[in-house]
Amino acid sequence: MARAACLLRAISRVLLLPLPLLLLLLLLLPSPLMARARPPESHRHHPVKKGPRLLHAALPNTLTSVPASHWVPSPAGSSRPLRCGVPDLPDVLNARNRQKRFVLSGGRWEKTDLTYRILRFPWQLVREQVRQTVAEALQVWSEVTPLTFTEVHEGRADIMIDFARYWHGDNLPFDGPGGILAHAFFPKTHREGDVHFDYDETWTIGDNQGTDLLQVAAHEFGHVLGLQHTTAAKALMSPFYTFRYPLSLSPDDRRGIQHLYGRPQMAPTSPAPTLSSQAGTDTNEIALLEPETPPDVCETSFDAVSTIRGELFFFKAGFVWRLRSGRLQPGYPALASRHWQGLPSPVDAAFEDAQGQIWFFQGAQYWVYDGEKPVLGPAPLSKLGLQGSPVHAALVWGPEKNKIYFFRGGDYWRFHPRTQRVDNPVPRRSTDWRGVPSEIDAAFQDAEGYAYFLRGHLYWKFDPVKVKVLEGFPRPVGPDFFDCAEPANTFR
């Protein structure tokens, strides 16, 4: 203090100012240090500049292990990882969690039948696309638990879904394109069930040209159901976004959600209903009995096979088997009507077109679904330029899904989705497909462009380059697709 007083007296003599006047001038002039620390007016009041700093401050010790592929340029020239906005727990990496990677939020729903409502939608996508994607994201969790989800369109739902910008009322502001993609609130918290997506992201479905809504939504719904972030490799509940297709739960995700809610409940079996001896005598209605027990997948042939949303669906006698990345999914086989209400049983053929619509054939009729929503049918095959007996198999071929072939007996037709007609009502002979049997039950194309033809318990793999069946085929379907025991005598 003595030194400061001496310094002020010295300055007063140099400037020829009385000491009281010098002190008054120092108080009135703005402090250079304070001026440097104060942000520009536009930044001080900008809602975006303040929010993300508060949010990222609550994300402890997570950015050091982020792969470079997760980082994107920000408007300021720095880099930000694409990630969920739910803060990570500090003890996610502690020793206690190394064996059990999944982390629970401490809450769970006390019921298994939940409702959801979408309040606002992103501008890039059609509303029905968003609804279908949200339903698929919830289905990822319902397939491995007893949970069910039903959409409602008014009032308060258990899960409230919204697309919002910047500050939106929950003290977790969004930051514009990139960075924070979405966040959600856990069960038994003050905003339980709320899920918010950043409206300013470039939302897409099923591709990496933007941010895949299906993957982000499925991740956020994991939070809504009670899961925290995990450090397990390739887990859906990792805090950082990486595009993966098709979407699937990791073993860690599955263990976590089943720890909270258990495994899916199997429908109780009951004796098959008996028909009265007078059934049909006083009515012209036909009673359709759904099968109660699926056929043995290792002993059966299949009615139809199709690649739908990047997954394989095998159809038989009203049931469907769903394979993702070569693995049968939990909860399957299941009744096909679980996905496609009103679908007849059995189906003769099925395929998914380039627009994502799914076509089913039975007898002289066909049906079209947009996802799981029926949009057409039953309609006559004659509308497509086909006459006579049913379609036995349908094959979508080519990377653009623009080559569709219908097979029947030893004949085939090429179908044009744009005109909704076959190119010629007169079929060509299936001998054009070298090595493929004349009579087939089903056909599909894999992700690498190979075509598969099924007949009975066997399948033939067709090379699109050499335009013929590969050496070593046919092979049995059961062992190659469902891990069945290899038959003792296999026809080669």
From Swiss-Prot:
Disulfide bonds join 298-484. Specifically expressed in the mammary gland during apoptosis. Keywords: Calcium, Cleavage on pair of basic residues, Collagen degradation, Disulfide bond, Extracellular matrix, Hydrolase, Metal-binding, Metalloprotease, Protease, Repeat, Secreted, Signal, Zinc, Zymogen. It is an enzyme of class 3 (hydrolase). One of its GO terms (cellular component) is extracellular matrix. Transmembrane segments: none annotated. The active site is at residue 220. The precursor is cleaved by a furin endopeptidase. The keyword Disulfide bond applies. Its main location: secreted. Residues 36-101 form a propeptide. Hemopexin repeats lie at residues 295-343, 344-386, 388-436, 437-484. Binds 1 Ca(2+) ion per subunit. Binds 2 Zn(2+) ions per subunit. Belongs to the peptidase M10A family. May play an important role in the progression of epithelial malignancies. This is Stromelysin-3. It comes from Mus musculus (Mouse). The gene is Mmp11.
